Amino acid sequence: MATSMLGSLLRIVRQVVPSSASGQARSYYVDWRMLRDVKRRKMAYEYADERLRINSLRKNTILPKHLQEVADEEIAALPRDSCPVRIRNRCVMTSRPRGVKRRWRLSRIVFRHLADHGQLSGIQRAIW
């Protein structure tokens, strides 16, 4: 009795909930690497002012060594992803990390493909 009721309930739920909701979820980002990079960019933006102030204390040679060491400890206490060195430019279409044209935020491969097919306005092949 209970199993048949559970089975009929499952059939009803499958009809009500669309199949896309139970399948793979799509997001704005191409893959997890791009999402990770976006999170790092947000973190670097949040801690940019604090990091700049602490680094200026660390690199100031006029201040006493004790104060510089305290600043070193404070920088070490900040999250790793707040450091702008960990940010990587990625292609917005493929998330490829290398060969990215910064102006268009596209990898060289995607850039050439789109330029060859006339999908980038103002871009044309060199003719001489």
Curated annotation (Swiss-Prot):
Alphabetized InterPro entries for the sequence: Ribosomal_uS14
Classification via Pfam families: Ribosomal_S14 (PF00253)
An annotated GO cellular component: mitochondrial small ribosomal subunit
Alphabetical GO biological process terms: mitochondrial translation; translation
GO molecular function (one): structural constituent of ribosome
Disulfide bonds: none
Localization: Mitochondrion
The entry's keywords: Mitochondrion, Ribonucleoprotein, Ribosomal protein
Keyword Mitochondrion among UniProt keywords: yes
UniProt keyword annotation of Cell inner membrane present: no
Family per similarity comment: Belongs to the universal ribosomal protein uS14 family.
Assembly and binders: Component of the mitochondrial ribosome small subunit (28S) which comprises a 12S rRNA and about 30 distinct proteins. Interacts with LIAT1.
Protein name: Small ribosomal subunit protein uS14m
Species assigned in the record: Bos taurus (Bovine)
